[in-house]
C-alpha cells in the first residue's frame, strides 16, 4: 500500500509540476526562431543586397553573445532574484528578444542600416542565450532526480522534439509569410510570440518546478567559477568538450554561399526553401524520438562517430548536387533542395543531443547551469569559427555573388575537413571502456 501510495503521490506531483509546460513552451519558441531568421536572410539579400560573404559574416557574428554563455551560467547559478535563479533569466531573455525583433519590424520599413540591424540581431541572440542557459540548467537539474524518466534522458529528448517542432512550424510558416506578405512580417510575429513567452514566464514560480535543492549560493560567483574550473579539469569532461568543439570548428561551412547559390543562381522560391528547412526540422524531431526510443543506451563515442561519418557523406552529396550529377540522373534541383539541403543543415546539430545527455550525467550537483552553459558556449564558438572559416574558404576558391565556378572545390575541402575529427574520437568519454581499463588494472 505504501509503495502504491508513493507512486500515486509522485504521479500527482508530476501532473502539478509545470516544468514540461515551461520548458515545452520555451524550447518551442527557441526552435521557432528560424521563422524570423529566414526572413532576415531574405531581407539582407533582397533589400540590403549584401553579398554571400557579408551574409555569412552577419549570420555568424550575430551568434557572438552565445559565446558568453558560461558567464550567464555562473551568474544564473549564483545570483538569485526573489529566491529564484532560473525563471528571472528566462523572463529577461524573452523580453530582450521581443524588444529587438519588434524594433527590427518597425525600423525595417524605413532604410535601416546594416549596423543597426546587426545590433538588434546581437541583442536578440543575447536574450536567446539567457533563455537557453536557464532552460538547459533546468533540464540538467531535473536529470539529477532519481526517476525513470530523467534517468533515461526522456526530458532532454522531450525538449529536443519540442524545439524541432518549433523549427518545423517556423520554417514552414516563414517561407509562406515571406512569399505572401514580406520578410518584415516575420519579425513582427516573432516579437509578439517572445512577448507572450515573457508574460507566461513571469507568472510561474520556481518553487512549483520541484527542482532538486542546490548547495547554498552563499559562495557567490567566485565559488561557482572555482567549481566550474574544478569540473573542467576532469579529463572525461574536458576531453569530451574539446572533441565536440573541434569536430565543428575545423569544418568550414559554406551556408551563405549555398543560400546564394540556391536563391540567386538556381532561383529557388522562398516557400520551397522554407519547406526544405521544414524537412530538416522534421529530421531533428524524428532524431529526438529515435534517440529516446532506441539509441540512448548506445555508447556516446560510437553514436557521435556515426553522426560525423553521416555528415561527411551528405557534404559529398552537396558536392555532387552542385556539379549537376543528380540533375543528369533526372533529379531536379528543386527536389534535391526540398528533401536534402535542409537536412544537411540540421545534421550538424544531431551531435548535440547525445552529447548534452552525456554531460548532464557527468556533471556534479550544483554546477549544472555553469557546465551546460560552458558546453553550449563552446559549441556556439565552434559554429562561429566554422562560419568564419567558410568565409575564408569561399574567398580562397573564388566564389562570388555572380561566379560559383569554385564552389565544388570548396565543398570538396569541406568534406575532407569533416573527416578530421574521426581521428580524435578517443577524446569522447566512454564509460564501458573506462570500466574495462579499471578491471585490467585491478
From Swiss-Prot:
Give the function comment from the record: Could mediate folate transport.
Membrane-spanning ranges = 23-43, 64-82, 87-107, 114-134, 158-178, 184-204, 241-261, 270-290, 302-322, 335-355, 379-399, 410-430
- Origin: domain of life: Eukaryota
| Gene3D superfamilies named in the record | MFS general substrate transporter like domains (1.20.1250.20)
Q: What is the lineage of its organism?
A: Eukaryota, Viridiplantae, Streptophyta, Embryophyta, Tracheophyta
**What main location does UniProt list?**
membrane
Q: Which UniProt keywords apply?
A: Membrane, Transmembrane, Transmembrane helix, Transport
Tell me what organism the protein belongs to: Arabidopsis thaliana
This chain's protein is named Probable folate-biopterin transporter 7
- State the GO CC annotations: membrane
Amino acid at each position: 500500500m505504501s509503495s502504491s501510495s508513493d507512486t500515486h503521490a509522485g504521479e500527482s506531483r508530476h501532473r502539478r509540476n509545470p516544468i514540461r509546460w515551461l520548458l515545452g513552451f520555451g524550447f518551442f519558441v527557441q526552435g521557432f526562431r528560424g521563422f524570423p531568421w529566414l526572413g532576415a536572410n531574405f531581407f539582407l539579400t533582397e533589400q540590403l543586397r549584401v553579398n554571400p560573404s557579408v551574409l555569412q559574416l552577419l549570420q555568424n557574428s550575430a551568434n557572438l553573445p552565445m559565446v558568453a554563455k558560461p558567464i550567464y551560467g555562473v551568474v544564473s547559478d549564483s545570483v538569485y532574484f526573489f529566491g529564484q535563479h532560473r525563471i528571472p533569466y528566462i523572463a529577461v531573455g524573452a523580453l530582450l528578444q521581443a524588444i529587438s525583433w519588434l524594433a527590427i519590424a518597425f525600423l525595417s520599413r524605413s532604410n535601416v542600416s546594416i549596423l543597426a540591424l546587426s545590433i538588434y540581431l546581437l541583442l536578440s541572440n543575447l536574450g536567446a542565450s539567457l533563455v537557453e542557459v536557464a532552460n538547459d540548467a533546468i533540464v540538467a537539474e531535473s536529470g539529477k532526480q532519481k526517476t525513470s524518466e530523467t534517468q533515461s534522458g526522456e526530458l532532454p529528448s522531450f525538449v529536443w522534439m519540442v524545439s524541432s517542432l518549433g523549427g518545423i512550424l517556423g520554417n514552414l510558416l516563414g517561407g509562406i509569410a515571406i512569399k505572401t506578405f514580406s520578410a518584415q512580417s516575420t519579425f513582427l510575429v516573432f516579437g509578439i510570440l517572445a512577448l507572450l513567452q515573457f508574460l507566461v514566464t513571469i507568472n510561474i514560480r520556481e518553487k512549483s518546478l520541484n527542482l532538486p535543492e542546490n548547495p547554498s549560493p552563499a559562495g557567490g560567483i567566485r565559488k561557482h567559477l572555482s567549481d566550474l574550473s574544478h569540473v573542467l579539469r576532469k579529463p572525461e569532461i574536458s576531453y569530451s568538450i574539446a572533441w565536440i568543439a573541434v569536430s565543428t570548428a575545423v569544418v568550414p561551412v559554406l551556408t551563405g554561399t549555398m543560400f546564394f547559390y540556391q536563391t540567386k543562381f538556381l532561383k529557388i522560391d522562398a516557400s520551397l526553401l522554407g519547406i526544405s528547412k521544414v524537412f530538416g526540422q522534421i529530421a531533428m524531431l524524428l532524431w529526438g524520438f529515435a534517440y529516446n526510443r532506441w539509441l540512448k543506451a548506445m555508447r556516446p563515442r560510437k553514436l557521435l562517430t556515426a553522426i560525423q561519418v553521416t555528415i561527411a557523406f551528405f557534404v559529398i552529396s552537396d558536392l555532387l548536387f552542385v556539379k549537376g550529377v543528380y540533375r543528369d540522373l533526372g533529379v531536379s534541383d528543386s527536389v534535391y533542395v526540398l528533401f536534402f539541403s535542409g537536412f544537411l543543415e540540421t545534421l550538424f546539430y544531431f551531435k548535440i543531443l547525445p552529447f548534452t545527455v552525456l554531460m548532464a550525467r557527468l556533471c556534479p550537483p550544483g554546477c549544472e547551469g555553469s557546465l551546460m552553459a560552458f558546453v553550449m558556449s563552446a559549441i556556439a564558438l565552434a559554429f562561429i569559427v566554422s562560419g568564419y572559416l567558410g568565409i575564408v574558404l569561399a574567398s580562397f576558391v573564388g566564389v562570388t555573388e555572380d561566379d560559383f565556378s569554385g564552389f565544388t572545390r570548396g565543398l570538396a575541402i569541406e568534406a575532407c575537413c569533416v573527416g578530421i575529427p574521426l581521428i580524435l574520437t578517443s577524446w569522447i568519454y566512454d564509460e564501458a571502456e573506462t570500466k574495462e581499463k579499471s578491471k585490467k588494472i585491478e
